[in-house]
Amino acid sequence: MAAGGKSFLADAGYGEQELDANSALMELDKGLRSGKLGEQCEAVVRFPRLFQKYPFPILINSAFLKLADVFRVGNNFLRLCVLKVTQQSEKHLEKILNVDEFVKRVFSVIHSNDPVARAITLRMLGSMASIIPERKNAHHSIRQSLDSHDNVEVEAAIFAAANFSAQSKDFAAGICNKISEMIQGLATPVDLKLKLIPILQHMHHDASLASSSRQLLQQLVTSYPSTKMVIVTLHTFTLLAASSLVDIPKQVQLLLQYLKNDPRKAVKRLAIQDLKLLANKIPHTWSRENIQALCESALHTPYDSLKLGMLSVLSTLSGTIAIKQYFSSAPGTAATTARSFDLVKLAQECCYHNNRGIAAHGVRILTNISASCQEKDLLPLEQDAVFGLESLLVLCSQDDSPGAQATLKITLTCMVKLVKCRPHLSQSVVESLLTQLHSAQDAARILMCHCLAAIAMQLPVLADGMLGDLMELYKVIGRSTTDKKQELLVSLATVIFVSSQKALSPEIKTVIKQQLENASNGWTAYRIARQASRMGNHDMARELYQSLLTQVASEHFYFWLNSLKEFSHAEQCLTGLQEDNYSSALSCIAEALKSYHKGIASLTAASTPLNPLSFQCGFVKLRIDLLQAFSQLICTCNSLKTSPPPAIATTIAMTSGNDLQRCGRISNQMKLSMEEFRNLAVRYGDLYQSSFDADSATLRNVELQQQSCLLISHAIEALILDPESANFQEYSSNGAAHVESEYERRMMSVFNHVLEEVESLNRKYAPVSYLHTACLCSAVIALLKVPLSFQRYFFQKLQSTSIKLALSPSPRNPAEPIAVQNNQQLALKVEGVVQHGSKPGLFRKIQSVCLNVSSVLQSKSGQDYKIPIDNMTNEMEQRVEPHNDYFSTQFLLNFVILDTHNITVESSVIDSNGIVWKTGPKTTIFVKSLEDPYSQQVRLQQQQGQPPSQQQQQRTAYSRF
């Protein structure tokens, strides 16, 4: 997680980066002061970019005040530009420090004679509702403008009223009656009523307000039966119910009633849309009767478009707790079989419908029922689901239209889900996929390959059977000329790598390389090499990286590819390990380390300030240290042969009282080795905690490396250092845990095998014998024989999150200390901005930011003060929740000792699961604690032998107090 640690925008005139921000603001200010309208508009519309680049309050406050001035004195077009900027920069509004001044300048335009100017001002106030929710003058202006005779102004007032109602309970309660009168008033035009009704969705601040709004909406639905009025009223009704969480079952019943009884298609469509919203948001409130009513409507409707909508709602519900409620035995229905339920009948009927969308929802419902309901009478539905999925697969794989591809995605997702929870169905599913692969369109083939890879990951037993078909297809695709060909080559290669569980045969390598030479570009070859590294096929990966070295234009890319080639070569060296040949194991590890050291040098050269490759470097350095620790452990085990315990070792152990002495010098070496593995486990834990943006597979990979270190340290302790107190219960693996990848499956298998061997030896033999050292060496070789997987985060970052910190006060020069008197406290303000990439919160989201402030005395003071240790350092921690990606807090720090103090502010992130991630950044400033003038004067007088005056004595006593 990259982060900018430099302090900027703290105090006026401080910091180099702030000068950049100030110069940018001055440049825009020059444009605002221009006499040309075009230049003024250009300056205004460039403000959002400025806010994005410098998102701290001091600049944003200055910028918004300048914009408010333009709004006050400019023409309506400029005001409109300022309004657009304000709406685009909504999340920065709360950083305005002088809210009163900003509002005052904007609000002055509300008294204009121009109704358009007033309308723009009302929209401006509405856009600022989040920072001025309780401003009474704004409330009054909105009420007044609702009575205006100018339509533009009234519409603007409606916009502002909706925004203020969402933010302010008082405004919502006060405006509710006014809105009610206007809606029911005969003088209000219908189009205005349609705009007023949606305001009622915000009347959810308390139960009584929600109830009165609901009654009004109920009256409107019955009083105004026109299509537009019913649609707007029903939708507002739904949004109010979803926000207030009151009367949701009643709302579901009302919508179902309109769906069943109202003949208008538009109303039915709206009812379906709102039912879908409620099914997504609150599925647990749906009763069995509600689902039954929806099933009946779907069974009886003659219109495919409506049936599709209803099935969409039912398929959403089928993936939630609502499906269990539906199948739970109702009174008097104990003997009902699964196939007699209307939902099942509907799904079976729709599975083979001529409309692809309807068929997709039908099979999705059957899949969800099979996955979530384990009752015996529901088991026959599995086969129905498989047949439905296979028929859809045949239909959609021949069609490359976007609709067919969307349906195919649903079908393949259902297949993976069904195979995961019903493994006995996997054989037929895989066979149907392989059969269709040959005749399918290329776009469909890519999706089908992804599906096959997902199934093979879950059920490796099926993988070997796929290889023949896949290799045939790979040869065929080489002759294809479609634009999807490159993507298909990558997808197929991935499935082949997953299917080849141990190592690629020479024939497979030859076919893949031949097709790449004939038909692919460099990027395709790189992607295939990346997948090979991920699946542990390092020999293939090394050859592909080698072939790409001469095809890149940038030296950074060259060094990156060269490092990947060296890492692949290093891991390939480890595949030659043999179980009982420990000397060859040492030479293999030495060869691997040689390549790893070359690779880390290239990797360091590939890094840039913007892309420091910190995770990659950290992961590889740990791998190097782990290999060295394994090598050292094998050497230590071998030393039992070259340097066995002396004959008097038992006597020495008895006289010294240290039982380990009877093992000779190997005991001390083993102790050092155990500590080394524990330190490596801690370092892997640190790498895990610093990888906030990593995907779950990468994190699991790091976790497995950490567990292998802990396993070896535990084995050393249990076999040699402390066999008496060895506890095997806490290390036993959880068999029920779901394994996501072949690499994890093989590592877990090794862990279990090693633990069993260690436990068996621990019970049978006393330490230390050749059996014990052989067991440790075998454990090391077993771990190294599992090919390392380089997961996605090593190659690409899908989620990017960074934190920028700004401290105030901050010095002009980072090396200069801030002066503080020792009898005062320093108020340190810490502000921060969370910056995201293109996919924020893809893997995990920031719940809060933990700020840790600590101060350390740089050198001891010359004077010998007897001060408690608590006053010498500051250690504080605060948790703050970012709002619109901004957070701010303050710390009060004491500096009693006269000297230079080093203050460190470190931020870490807490995600929505409460896990702490050590993401940084870490910022440091210096504070020089100075003696206050009065104490200095008293001390000097005492040194000169002059008694202080009475008044001075009183002040001294007071200051001491």
Swiss-Prot record:
Signal peptide (from-to): none
Disulfide bridge positions per record: none
One GO CC term on file: INTAC complex
InterPro entries cross-referenced by the UniProt entry: ARM-like, ARM-type_fold, INTS7, INTS7_C, INTS7_HB, INTS7_N
Subcellular location: Nucleus; Chromosome; Cytoplasm
Biased composition range(s): Low complexity: 937-955
Region called Disordered, residue ranges: 937-961
PANTHER family on file: C1ORF73 PROTEIN, INTEGRATOR COMPLEX SUBUNIT 7
Family named by the database record: Belongs to the Integrator subunit 7 family.
Protein name per UniProt: Integrator complex subunit 7
Taxonomic lineage from the root: Eukaryota, Metazoa, Chordata, Craniata, Vertebrata
